[in-house]
């Protein structure tokens, strides 16, 4: 079943969560680990594959516990976005390179 566009009136879906909100979620997860004194590799960069793997596993294991609350939507369950989050966690390039790749892919064939 294809997801419907979010109307912000009730159930919010995968089209509703922005990349910046996902990045903020990653920062909050790392802050939670620091707060609980679980500090192993919390300073690891996302591209440091070996060191950041424990953080990735923690995020994956706890997706069902996270909810994003903003002024446009009161509750957005993060677990509904698991594929998108997995893709972001799997990026092996800096974001500038990833942005250039996506933009060139999207706008390679101009239709307007």
UniProtKB/Swiss-Prot annotation:
UniProt KW Metal-binding keyword: no
**What Pfam families would the database entry show?**
Baculo_LEF-11
Which keywords are on file for this protein? Transcription, Transcription regulation
Q: Look up the record and give one Gene Ontology term from the biological process aspect.
A: regulation of DNA-templated transcription
Asked if the record carries the keyword Cytoplasm, the reply is no
The superkingdom listed in its UniProt entry is Viruses
What InterPro entries does the database record attribute to this sequence? Answer: Baculo_LEF-11
- Described function: Involved in late/very late gene activation.
Family stated for the protein in its record: Belongs to the baculoviridae LEF-11 family.
What is the recorded name of this protein? Late expression factor 11
Q: Which source organism does the UniProt entry give?
A: Rachiplusia ou multiple nucleopolyhedrovirus (strain R1)
